């Protein structure tokens, strides 16, 4: 699926799971606008999902934003700028206030996102799946997904129940490398050399 968000429990009274769909990268100008990185595809889809919630902190190994609490924020302006996006947030009217938001994750309620289609997956649904080689070897669990220029990468970390404790980077190539996914069984099957 196009949106690459990671799940995180809603805090502060929100009833829905929040999905990380972007991040504030920097400031734009002197009137409080912020540069935004969107994990959605196309990037401008980020504008559709309101309200936003902001949370300071990097993603932890489980894919959830680890530090801080979610705070709702209203988007009052949004537009493409160069190769990216910029947004104006309610109550943020100068460069200093905008700078205080840099590095914060943008979360939206999961129920705002469209259902994934047949054979499509949100990254948040893949985190935690057990990864099995086509010959049955257990390679570990999906800890995160990484977007690269050529193709996305599944990061698999071995544990005490797997072949070894190595971390593997497996290209997201459905049908070629990723041969099957069963969310119901919590498994992903891959045709990938375990030595890599």
Swiss-Prot record:
Pfam families: PRC (PF05239), RimM (PF01782). GO terms for molecular function: ribosome binding. It comes from the Bacteria. Its main location: cytoplasm. One of its GO terms (cellular component) is ribosome. InterPro entries: PRC-brl_dom, PRC_barrel-like_sf, RimM, RimM_N, RimM_N_sf, Transl_B-barrel_sf. One of its GO terms (biological process) is ribosomal small subunit biogenesis. An accessory protein needed during the final step in the assembly of 30S ribosomal subunit, possibly for assembly of the head region. Essential for efficient processing of 16S rRNA. May be needed both before and after RbfA during the maturation of 16S rRNA. It has affinity for free ribosomal 30S subunits but not for 70S ribosomes. PANTHER family: RIBOSOME MATURATION FACTOR RIMM (PTHR33692:SF1). The PRC barrel domain binds ribosomal protein uS19. This is Ribosome maturation factor RimM. It comes from Alcanivorax borkumensis (strain ATCC 700651 / DSM 11573 / NCIMB 13689 / SK2).
